[in-house]
Amino acid sequence: MVSLRDNIEVQPLSHNKRVRKNFGHINLVADIPNLIEIQKNSYEKNFLQLDTKDSERKNKGLQSILNSIFPISDPSNIANLEFVKYEFDTPKYDVEECTQRSLSYDSALKVTLRLSIWDIDEDTGSREIKGIKEQQVYMGNIPLMTKNGTFIINGTERVVVSQMHRSPGVFFYHDEGKVHSSRKLLYSARVIPYRGSWLDLEFDAKDIIYFRIDRKRKLYATTLLKAIGMSTEEIIKFYYDSVNYKVVKNKGWAVKFMPSHITAHRLTSDLIDADTGNVLLKAGQKITPRLAKKYAGEGLNNILVSHKALIGKYLSEDLKDPESDEILAKIGEMITVELLSVISDLKIKNISVLVINPQSGPYIRNTLFSDKNQDRESALFDIFRVLRPGEPANIEAAESLFYNLFFDPERYDLSEVGRIKMNSRLELNISDETTVLTTDDIKNILRVLVELKDRKGIIDDIDHLGNRRVRSVGELIENQFRIGLVRMEKSVVERMSAGDIDTVMPHDLVNSKILVSVVKEFFSTSQLSQFMDQTNPLSEITHKRRLSALGPGGLSRDRAGFEVRDVHPTHYGRICPIETPEGQNIGLINSMATYARINKHGFIESPYRKVKDGHVTDEVVYLSAIEEGKYKIGQANSKVDKDGILQGEFINCRVEGGNFVMVEPHEVDFIDVTPMQVVSVAASLIPFLENDDANRALMGSNMQRQAVPLIKTDAPFVGTGVEGVVAKDSGASVLALNDGIVEQVDSNRIVIRAIAQKTESAPSVDIYNLLKFQKSNHNTCINQKPLVKVGHYVKKNDIIADGPSTDNGEIALGRNVLVAFLPWNGYNFEDSILISERIVKEDVFTSVHIEEFEVIARDTRLGPEEITRDIPNVSEEALRHLDEVGIIYVGAEVKAGDILVGKVTPKSESPITPEEKLLRAIFGEKAFDVKDSSLHVPSGVSGTVVEVRVFSRRGVEKDQRAIAIEKQQIEKLAKDRDDELEIIEHFVFSWLEKLLVGQVSINGPKTVKTGQTITSEILKGLSKGQLWQFTVEDANVMNEIEQLKGHYDGKKEALNKRFATKVEKLQSGDDLPQGALKVVKVFIATKHKLQPGDKMAGRHGNKGVISRIVPEEDMPFLEDGTVVDIVLNPLGLPSRMNIGQVLETHLGWASVNLAKKIAGLVEEHKTKHASIEKIKKFLIELYGENINHILEKSDEEIISFCNEAAKGVYFATPVFDGAKVEDVKDMLRLAGQDLSGQVKLIDGRTGEYFDRLVTVGQKYLLKLHHLVDNKIHSRSIGPYSLVTQQPLGGKSHFGGQRFGEMECWALQAYGAAYTLQEMLTVKSDDVNGRIKIYDSIVRGENNFESGIPESFNVMIKEFRSLCLNVKLEVTS
């Protein structure tokens, strides 16, 4: 290990960064937001508010739930329990310890509660305080989130997936004509609260309006209006306008002329001006709205209509006799011929009539007259009977039920989002804090529903992202918490009324188990809390950014239709249109787009650049789907000049509804930030995505998540420029916490001296312990390798160590290999892949997989199980890998069947024969009392033991192995402490020397005289402890020395304290499950080399299985002798339409050949001492301006850069903005290659050229998780099914190969009767036949007899269950 004391010069780390030639044309103004902030913000910021002081906590998340549940009072109002504040303890174990010990990473929630007890005067009812007790109460452990946005539950890493659900609010829609045979549209409205009862309002085929509560029996909508306190008159006045008819002597009635109520139609009677008597239009002539407006403009105020025209109109107020005030007809009644004659007899001059015409239908009036309920009371009773059938109704119960349904904040919650949506849809102005329904809401929902029926307005699109919102982790757990606390509230009230309230303390009232069980249940069993996909860093990130429409309160797979699964125009820039699973979950599980974020209301937002008067600014604005509809948004690739002015006469823009229009530059409001914002992280890693068919792009993005981390990683030559971001945000790499200088590096840890802000204070030291060969959730290997050297200066957030599947800080899921597209002897038929032996020989695609095996020694009723080497009837050979305790050594090579941990279990005594008794008496044989229950390596597993962990229960004596492991861990901790102390001391004492030199000593060590000036020679002869003994004349310096000593002592004490705590944790024993005395975990690492049957894929959905490994000498090779690594079938391209892979291959070919060119120039520079300018010129030609920061450095650094580039030139071709065909040709031209990208290939077997030119190039291939080793197995004798007695199937059951129905047909077709009989009987489920055939084989005979198969007996039993007695009569 190297240390900084070896005087190595400090150099910045930045020169390690990889340079890529970028083909992107669009200037990025916004960085990709942190890819896992959706998880962290939701849980830590919004739910727990961990880093916020009590007084500054906002009323959201945990704070809001506790505020809403408390205060809790007892029924008699004597006691009152209030919430004051909450806090969290520091977790007992850190993340790594929790993973190792199979514990949950959580923290104790401590809530401060105040119990007030009141004295109530029985006579006057007045209350006064009797006593107040305040106490901190433990309310259970709450899981904490790790820095990577995951949870550790029982030692496994889990992710809570965000859920897409329908936003609370009101929705209007119709049935699309599906319900009624006439294809008539039946409109309906639905109010969906965040929690509480659903309210539906709907039309039926007869245009009567009904309502339902929670999908129960329907009632008339006017019953609901009456239940909220509206009278018939109020209902009619609210929903209808009225118009006045005045009688005109002997002519008819005069009525106000309203152009707005007129639609184009032919007149049935003359249009007469009532004031002048002029006929404006004759009957039969056509009137239009335009003509009507013209007449109104010319002064037409009233028109004359006949008596007949009033028939069929509805009264807008009660019709009374002018003399007696008697009501002749009620409001809303229809005017009939009889009523009209009464009106003329009584000489009534004025009649007010409802405006009901084609634009305003009579639906509410008709519903009102169908409804039998006349007042509020009868309406409430009606609702009560529907919701509580069979219960006796009284007005109090009915009122209370109706109030609790929609108006009680405890039981009904629209949420702030629901209120905002409701206000905007109904054009109301109710406060956001009102999260229950109001009477205005109900009245206006009905108004909008009727307007829709009258063809005004449009229905809502349920799949619009303005109507779907995301519930993230914080919110999901908040809902669980609320359930737990509501349950707990009931138990608190019970306990308050049960005991003597004066002596009770707050902690006696609270039962935290209720809350804990709810939270625990959510994390371990909820559909949305999932085992993290940890195959590689990309799969982790994608899992955390996933959006699921399934889960509690969501959709179910079977019910989800096509519309929900489909891509919607509002998905643009919010949800990826590409990445979704194939199969039944397609479209229900989505991924967030790269730049998308979730706003405080749960709606997904996408970023846009603001455009002012045709000038594109750098201001980035995030818009939700609702806001976006108001603007015209241009595409990211719209032409812009160097001043940011949009070019061209018209710009193609998106407007509401996903339509595209051409608008002038000054009308554009925003443009996209980058074309990449449309797709998800996985899709943005596919170069030339724009050249692939969408179905294949979907497979490509899904298969990248299945790539296994390889031993040797290799970033893609042809990338997209996003690789670095993914590696950084995934948490696989190690990032520097502070600026600093690397002090020490080895493969296990990196020590960095953080550069302090203030020079006087002692520096802090960051020690990064790297993960070595740890097992991931999917048994892949997590291993971190340092990237820094001693002396490197690192900045905060620099990548200092690579993790699995990362290379130099970029994600590297596969390897760059030389590929040729050509058919080769049929070995690449049907997408098979042919590989060269070099790939196996040089471990190009070799991966390490780690399996964990666990054995538990329990306390049984016959005595404790014991982990030991002393196992009955086991040979010494079988125990060769075990130590004296009975646990395998680290480094042992094991195969299936080997013993990993020796364990014996006591067995019950069986009666002993006299002979055995005698033997025991002679030999003292005790081994009969125990049976062997050792842990063996299961079938199909072999490899090397890489780690052993031993956990002992507290109070159980540790064995030697456990003590040895513990000692090793303590030594590691001590080394960390000593190194940290050494760095601090080095700094402190060199600073102290600086302060002392040149000062006059007043007091000090014996060797220094008083008044002597201190020199560095004097100090060299003193020990470190003696340096602190000086007192100097200068008071300021003395002050500084004291401060420095304070810092030093504080740091030293903190270090020792931390060390002691960790050691104590190690030595104290472990919390093991019930009954377990000792747990041993053994980890076996297996190397998987590439072999036939393994699945491989490119990034373009081009997948295949390896068919054959061909010796290098037989593979096709290039003219310079380079052997091709992989041969793919060219026929896999045309029908699949993923042309991106061809462009990738061509650009990869350019990359290799440019690298050769650079290597040639460097060689020329070394041997012929050619000028470095030639190299610089070539680099500028290749990289453009990207390379300026390299060219400014020294010649040595330029040459070192070229040496890296000589391994392969790296390109970045961002999606939808990458290299075009011309760019690829330019690169091939620069590399001196044929522009077709094809070369002459020579057949390795014959040495002859192939007939045609072949496409060859470097391509990025991945090895997928579907390894043949984990799939293939063979069975000799194994388990049988209990009922049918047929062998089981599948690898996990050690099953056989099923000879199925179709296979039987094949034998029947060949007439192979005996073979068929053998298959159906002795080789399957003829039990007696099986035993006999086994006997005959043992005897060396070859004859057998078929009996009756068990399945025949099963069939007879099934007949009997149908009461058919079938007997089998055997005739001799």
Swiss-Prot record:
InterPro entries: DNA-dir_RNA_pol_bsu_ext_1_sf (IPR042107), DNA-dir_RNA_pol_bsu_external_1 (IPR019462), DNA-dir_RNA_pol_su2 (IPR015712), DNA-dir_RNAP_su2_dom (IPR007120), DNA-dir_RNAP_su2_hyb_sf (IPR037033), RNA_pol_bsu_bac (IPR010243), RNA_pol_bsu_CS (IPR007121), RNA_pol_bsu_protrusion (IPR007644). The keyword Transcription applies. GO terms for biological process: DNA-templated transcription. Coiled coil: none annotated. Keywords: DNA-directed RNA polymerase, Nucleotidyltransferase, Transcription, Transferase. PROSITE patterns: RNA_POL_BETA. One of its GO terms (molecular function) is DNA-directed RNA polymerase activity. It is an enzyme of class 2 (transferase). It catalyses: RNA(n) + a ribonucleoside 5'-triphosphate = RNA(n+1) + diphosphate. GO terms for cellular component: DNA-directed RNA polymerase complex. Its EC number is 2.7.7.6. Transmembrane segments: none annotated. Signal peptide: none annotated. HAMAP family: RNApol_bact_RpoB. Belongs to the RNA polymerase beta chain family. DNA-dependent RNA polymerase catalyzes the transcription of DNA into RNA using the four ribonucleoside triphosphates as substrates. NCBIfam families: PRK00405.1, rpoB. The RNAP catalytic core consists of 2 alpha, 1 beta, 1 beta' and 1 omega subunit. When a sigma factor is associated with the core the holoenzyme is formed, which can initiate transcription. PANTHER family: DNA-DIRECTED RNA POLYMERASE I SUBUNIT 2. This is DNA-directed RNA polymerase subunit beta. It comes from Rickettsia bellii (strain RML369-C).
